Amino acid sequence: MSKFLLRPYFKGLRLLLIACWIIAPSFAIAQVDDAQTGKAVFEVLASEIALQRGEAGLAYSTYMEMARQYKDPRLAQRAMEIGITGGSPELALNAAKTWENLSPSSQTKPKEVLVTLLILSNRWSEAVKPAIALLKQQNPSQRESTLAQLQALLAKAKDESDALRAFYEIASTAKPDIKDPSLLYTYAMSAEKAGHLDVMEKTLREILRKNPNDANSLNALGYSLADRNIKLQEAFALITKAHQLSPKDSFILDSLGWVNFRLGKNTLALEQLQQAFKMKPEADIAAHIG
């Protein structure tokens, strides 16, 4: 038999193996009758054939119906994979929710995937509950790794404030375990967005105790104090040090201008703010110039 004639045979064998891989474990546990098992295998085969023919929607729908009927998370997982491959994030997300709901609570992979898909869909607030559930099942090292992944996704958020508030709620679950300075800084900024200025200040001071030359933390703490018009001398000292460490940073120069304005040094403040705006014409800097 030529290798060309063997291709359909191996293709059919592959489909059968997929069906058995998905169906066999759960049906063995459930101890259903042979007729029901045969029907399920047929439906899986039909779905995979439909998928190969370009009928991804039909394959997806069949897998989702089967997942609900047989309470089998692996069928929902397969539907999710079809949704992702087909470039249908909403369908993939719906399947991921079903996968997570049907899976044993001890399994973390469905939660990881669900959280990622929710965040990529800019549904940060919806991601809070499954993300917290995931963190509670992880060890400290795993928690920090998960938070680092979420931190990287903040840059893709359409609504940064909403994303940071959600990040704060999630990260608060693991705060005692966070050691990475970058994560602590993001946690501090998220605390500010969530309205917890006390937590922000405490976290920034924690960073500075370990690294007194962290320019971003110096600037963030100093600006927060200046913006609230409190501890202005400390704010000036913090921002001045940050400026010395990063003299070309327009946002730090903006903070320096702002604290000088709070201190009544209006001429110097205006000069620094205008210079900062010239370096980076951002709306936040322009607002300080007035």
PLM feature segments, named:
Residues Q31-G290:
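Alpha-solenoid helical repeat scaffolds
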Residues S2-L16:
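Bacterial N-terminal signal peptides that target proteins for export
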Residues R14-P25:
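Bacterial N-terminal signal peptides
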